[in-house]
């Protein structure tokens, strides 16, 4: 049976958006789609963080969701956090249209992202290839512009 989830992104900045998730089979890929507005043109890191806690804004969401204790990487890398979804690309109008599939995240089981926080960052994620310690943890993606807790949808 297909599972669906949704995340409404908000923050202290004008950045906001809605991201949808759908997984047709429990061990199948997750389709991710939606849009984010209010961004500066270019790439912005896009990650699932460990906690669904937004009491202190996006900072209380903790580090990237990483149940396998791996180093940070890109979405197509073998070595990556479960929550490493790479970058979204905003056009001149400040809008990022999101549409991709990911086979590492899940909407159920040990790698479930339900109840965790999705974050869009101020800078591009270097996908762990930045040549310093921070790159292997965060991808040097900078501050957290907007976030939201991923919840079950109809």
From Swiss-Prot:
Q: Where N-acetylalanine occurs along the chain?
A: 2
Instruction: Specify the domain of life of the species encoding this protein.
Output: Eukaryota
Q: What is this protein called?
A: Superoxide dismutase [Cu-Zn]
Q: What is its main location?
A: cytoplasm
Give residues with lipid attachment (S-palmitoyl cysteine). 7
Compartments it resides in:
Cytoplasm; Nucleus
Cofactor field: Cu cation; Zn(2+)
């Amino acid at each position: 049976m297909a599972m669906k989830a949704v995340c409404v992104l908000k923050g202290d900045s004008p950045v906001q958006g809605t991201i949808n998730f759908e997984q047709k089979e429990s061990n199948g890929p997750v389709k991710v789609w939606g849009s984010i507005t209010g961004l500066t043109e270019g790439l912005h890191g896009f990650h699932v963080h460990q906690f669904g806690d937004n009491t202190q804004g996006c900072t209380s969401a903790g580090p990237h969701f990483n149940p396998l204790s791996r180093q940070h990487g890109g979405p197509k890398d073998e070595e990556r956090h479960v929550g490493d979804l790479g970058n979204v690309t905003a056009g001149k109008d400040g809008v990022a249209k999101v549409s991709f599939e990911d086979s590492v995240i899940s909407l159920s089981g040990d790698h479930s992202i339900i109840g965790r926080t999705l974050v869009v960052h101020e800078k591009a994620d270097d996908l762990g290839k930045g040549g310093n310690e921070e790159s292997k943890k965060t991808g040097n993606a900078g501050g957290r512009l907007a976030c939201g807790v991923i919840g079950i949808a109809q």
